[in-house]
């Protein structure tokens, strides 16, 4: 069965309840939310998120809790060599895991971090140490942190599969570490999904393990392979292309994994309902952007 959805915003006053209703209106059976704005750490109180109402809708629509995904804000950096800033990040992400657990979301996607003025290996060590502290603070939870593949902009860690696996290997309680594949990021980092898809999928298994992949972000790319740009494009309108993305979405190795669209809005309107329809029909609509 295909588990497909998109990022949906949690907006006041309906918050989580509204996000679930929006996802269902798109024809989705999976979704991803931030527990607040991705660009800051301001958060609405958990008791105001309308969690009970949201979970009733989930149950009434036969949605699986395993297909609900959380995402940490972009601005958190566990690789920051500044101890004060890193301590804040550790405390904040511990609170985020508590919030997602209250929402019955069992995985939180995280951009691993930026090593800034140090080096990749030091950054990897700091991320692993930080995750150890986070998992100790939240040892009563089972919520996973899904480390995301990155495009390799600047000093990003996670630009290759090996860096992500190194983090997981160094974490003591690594049963709570999984991975999120992002198609745009992989392509922009130099993994040519268009030309070498099966080879890359086998590499994902040998380095990360299929059993450790918990989320896949489905995005086309505005830029060429190995560009290190990280600019998402609508499905089929970028350099990866519809057919390649379809092969990934329907690949047997990823059958049970929720796929989440993070494609750009078109004229300030969410394209997800139309993109989900295209994917389910397995037919690209070159006129899609004209519909908005």
From Swiss-Prot:
Cross-referenced NCBIfam families: nfo, PRK01060.1-1
Keywords: DNA damage, DNA repair, Endonuclease, Hydrolase, Metal-binding, Nuclease, Zinc
Swiss-Prot/TrEMBL catalytic activity: Endonucleolytic cleavage to 5'-phosphooligonucleotide end-products
CDD domains, A to Z: AP2Ec
EC number per UniProt: 3.1.21.2
Amino acids binding Zn(2+) 1: 71, 111, 148
Physiological role: Endonuclease IV plays a role in DNA repair. It cleaves phosphodiester bonds at apurinic or apyrimidinic (AP) sites, generating a 3'-hydroxyl group and a 5'-terminal sugar phosphate.
Gene: nfo
Coiled-coil features, chain-numbered ranges: none
Family: Belongs to the AP endonuclease 2 family.
Known cofactor(s): Zn(2+)
Signal peptide: none
Binding site for Zn(2+) 3: 185, 230, 232
Cofactor binding, note field: Binds 3 Zn(2+) ions.
HAMAP family assigned to the protein according to its UniProt record, in alphabetical order: Nfo
GO molecular function: deoxyribonuclease IV (phage-T4-induced) activity; DNA binding; DNA-(apurinic or apyrimidinic site) endonuclease activity; phosphoric diester hydrolase activity; zinc ion binding
Entry annotated with the keyword Heme: no
Example of a GO biological process term: base-excision repair
Binding site for Zn(2+) 2: 148, 182, 217, 262
Taxonomic superkingdom: Bacteria
UniProt xrefs under InterPro entries: AP_endonuc_2, AP_endonuc_F2_Zn_BS, Xyl_isomerase-like_sf, Xyl_isomerase-like_TIM-brl
Protein name: Probable endonuclease 4
